[in-house]
Amino acid sequence: MTQPLFLIGPRGCGKTTVGMALADSLNRRFVDTDQWLQSQLNMTVADIVEREEWAGFRARETAALEAVTAPSTVIATGGGIILTEFNRHFMQNNGIVVYLCAPVSVLVNRLQAAPEEDLRPTLTGKPLSEEVQEVLEERDALYREVAHIIIDATNEPSQVISEIRSALAQTINC
């Protein structure tokens, strides 16, 4: 199987952490769309949003998704990548989409534990727990709609990787 694997889910679900280790375990290349975009522009996500607003960032995010999609690649996407219909169809049609699902309490705890690792401009202007709740309520149905595989991301990364590998094996053997 050489299809790209797209990891989707909200901030703090473990897309980058799991993605790097998953790519290593599958002997694949790893790319994080946000990191790729930031390195191409030499700007942070916050800088891009400040300069181009969210619409400009979302357009660049789509271009990044297309640019990094390649066989034998694990791709960690930004949490809002599913907001654009083109991106949802693109991922579904060009690879296997894995939704790393976690409840609000877990996401908030992870984001508070390492706030500097995931600096993003606020989407709502609300406190973190309220924002995570609101954003997840808005996006969960889209994550589920686009996903080929849904994984409980509350476990340790090694367990999440094991579950993804098992699900991939079942998907391939259908």
UniProtKB/Swiss-Prot annotation:
Major location (coarse): cytoplasm
Binding-site residues, Mg(2+): 16, 32
Example of a GO MF term: shikimate kinase activity
Record organism: Escherichia coli O81 (strain ED1a)
Top-rank taxon, per record: Bacteria
One BP term from GO: amino acid biosynthetic process
Subcellular localization, as worded in the UniProt entry: Cytoplasm
Record protein name field: Shikimate kinase 2
